[in-house]
Amino acid sequence: MFLFTDRQVIYIVLACVCCLSILFLFLFPLLKKVIYRRSFKKRYYSVINKLVLDEDYLLINSFIIKGLNIKIDHIIFANKFIYLVKDEYYEGAIEGKIKDNKFIYYPYKNRDVLTVPNPYIKLKEDFDNIVRLAGIDANFFQLVTLINNDVLINVEKNKQNNYHIISRGNLINEIKEIENAAKVHDFNQDALVKAAKDIARINERGVKRGRRK
């Protein structure tokens, strides 16, 4: 029967530890991306929920009208604007013009240049329908595509300057900047609640309110 010496056992253990460490370092980034890709909507919601609670905003989640194929992930009723937010996840970089039907997409570790649908087009279509159905002034709205932090973006603004592509990590600050920079009066609170109820009425969801300051 062959027996290992103490030194050989130590070498074997160290070799196993080194192999496992190398394997972990190689697989961890891939595993992290898979986990993030599957849970990105929850991460986005946590940031939006923090904004709503901290600023005492109103929030409708998962706005859907199946007959018109309308799907808005979050509707934030802030002090000066109503934000229609759609969640998107990209692994790489995107660029394009606001009028393009598709954006150019450069996935990580992929030399092929691909295309993805321009998220603004569907969001604008849903926005137009919501304005029509709810009877709310279109000037009260801002449109937001919410993306993951590690995607690179090169997309021009639309002429109305009411469309924004914002990363999860910058959402709170950018919403605050939009609100602070806008040269319009705050919503009347009763009118804001009415607008939220009008939109909730054509959905089938309730309205969530942040805490009082």
List where the protein language model places each region:
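Surface-exposed interaction regions that form or flank ligand-binding interfaces
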Residues: 1-70, 77-83, 88-97, 103-213
